[in-house]
Amino acid sequence: MCIRDSLYTGAAPEAELIVVKLGLPGNSGGAEEGFPRTTEILRGVTYALRKAGQLNMPLVINLSFGNSYGSHDGSSLLERFLDNASEIGKTVICVGSGNEGAARGHFAGNITRDSRAELAVGNYEKSLNIQLWKNYSDVFRIRLQSPGGEEAELTTNIQGGKYTLRLEQTRILVYLGEPLPYAVAQEIYLEMIPVTGSYINAGIWTIRLEPIMTVTGQYYLYLPAGNGRGDSTGFYRSTPKVTLTVPSTA
């Protein structure tokens, strides 16, 4: 219950609070420390909706967090869930949109000829992931070049949907997204980890895209949010648009 006798009054002094704890430090299952899993968010929102229904009260849900993982087109399970949740009863959902516009973590383009994205990787990066999102109907030839000039072509139709490459002293784990009934975007996910030592190769990494067959030709590259990488790591020619953190893209 908000304090009614305080000198300062907020926008809704008569409001009651439902506080739902999400995420635990040291969570198992690969979740970032302290950051909730998608399932925990779904359960927390569901609990708040049910509680508001039991009390016959309007509900405002505040989700003051987010990350850069996703296609940013509103098609993910979490984004669609929040869209549907906002239509239940008298419900308003407020989601933080982050502050990633100047963090150099996003690059986008429309491929009509050979395109490239140059990524600066700073010193002492223990690992780094890159998301490439495109339309499933588009077929690109994708090449990755290391700072030392070693180059590899990324196969996008391999059986099993995952494989490993090595460029210099960096191992690249490649995961190919599968079609989903509710999404037309395909994800190609790259995880860079050191082969020896503690850090991946620093310098300029180049991603080259060559169109083979295009329908939309649009592509989007995302890095982890700024607090998940060094200040000197980012795209040289970044795209500040569509840098809202997920799930504010719902």
Language-model segments: residues:
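Loop-rich non-cytosolic ectodomains and luminal regions
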Residues: 4-250
